[in-house]
Amino acid sequence: MSRKSCTFVRSNGRVAMNVEINQQRIDYLLSLYKMTRDDLLTQLNENRSRGYSLSDINGKMMAFSLLKNIDKIFQVGVEYYLDFSAISPKKSSSIFFRKTKFGSNLNMEAKRRVQSFEMLKSELDAYWKLSDISIPKLSVHLTIQDDPYQSALKVRELFYPRNVAKKDRDFLKEFINKLAEQYIYVFEFVETWNKKELANIDGAFIGPNMIVLKRQKSFKREIFTLAHELGHCLLREEEIEALDLPSMAAGGSLTAVEKWCNDFAFCFLMGDKLSEFDLIEHADDTNDYERDRIDYFSSATHVSRLALYTRLVMAHKMSNAHYQLVRADLDAQYQRMINADIEQMEKKGGASPQPIISNFYKDTLCCALYNGIINEAKFCKELRVKPDEMYKYFA
């Protein structure tokens, strides 16, 4: 419920607007992001000649210009602070209240991204509830006591795409929509190449049925992340993380859950090629690091060459020294690809690619529109379609 009470004051010859805000909502965000009001004040006063004070942010009434600056930090929309409905930091409201430690040290942008998808998920759940439709719960439930390799092979029929595409992006799209058949939301977000702060995560699983993916220059990396997060989903183990293959190769410490999900993802994607891959005895300079066979497996399974070499190191079939040489070469190839993409985007004006939209998300919005819960403008905006193209979703 929004009161939208406001006053106008004259300051330094200018008329400024003050608005009544719900301080409880600022407290909620500070709790969510593990910040204090002093932390908030420090961020607000960065690069400012005249700083704000605690009294400026603690009052019932707040300068609208200050409120907009606060929202530049949290990015939830100004209307959020003008809403006086009750809100409290409960475990049911956010993964940040259910977990205190994550697989990565999350930066502010990573937290903002995850929170935005949590807010979206709450909307989608409300659409189904208002439509009086219950979404079936996932039928598969695994534990880390289950063998990850055997488990991956068993669930492939449910979650692996039927029509295997050759191109990595097409495969990723089919993979996302295969999960949609099991009522799992997959949301992909795309960051612009020239953005000031980038989210330092690759993916996240937020229970009970939402996976978030960061668009990567390498779709193979994104595919592996999706398979990894599917493992979290089947274990019912929430996580927000960046996947670090070199650290795995170096024997970096992993939790039992992370190791299980990595093994699950690798086996899930390799499928019947796994036994053939296991026949590789060693990879070093005497056999050109098995480049031809690695290229073959990577092309056939959508598993990156780096992930395949990482597995060889973990299986003691490749030395860490040889791995670092190969990795340096792969990193150089990857960087050249990124530089070429940036150069191309600069020539085209910097247009960003669009995220893949899950069929489950489309179905949710179609249901909401059909039942009068959202309007046509909202439908077209979310799916990025023109009004005269809406009929395609209801054919």
Locations of regions flagged by a protein language model:
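Active-site hotspot residues in diverse enzymes, especially metal/ion-binding acidic/histidine motifs
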Residues: S2-A395
